[in-house]
Curated annotation (Swiss-Prot):
Function: Plant non-specific lipid-transfer proteins transfer phospholipids as well as galactolipids across membranes. May play a role in wax or cutin deposition in the cell walls of expanding epidermal cells and certain secretory tissues.
Protein name: Non-specific lipid-transfer protein P2
Family membership: Belongs to the plant LTP family.
Keywords, in A-Z order: Lipid-binding, Secreted, Transport
Organism: Vitis sp. (Grape)
One example GO MF annotation: lipid binding
Keyword Transport among UniProt keywords: yes
Primary site of residence: secreted
Transmembrane spans: none
Annotated compartments: Secreted
Length: 38
């Protein structure tokens, strides 16, 4: 099961992208890979 903490940490690397647009931070994949492996 995925916890709220896992979701928060996975998305935190992408918050700047979500707020400002532009390129996704390299290697972050917005936490999608981490969530899929949870």
């Amino acid at each position: 099961a995925i916890t709220c903490g896992q979701v928060s940490s996975a998305l935190s690397s992408c918050l700047g992208y979500l707020k400002n647009g532009g390129a996704v931070p390299p290697g972050s994949s917005c936490g999608i890979k981490n969530l899929n492996s949870a």
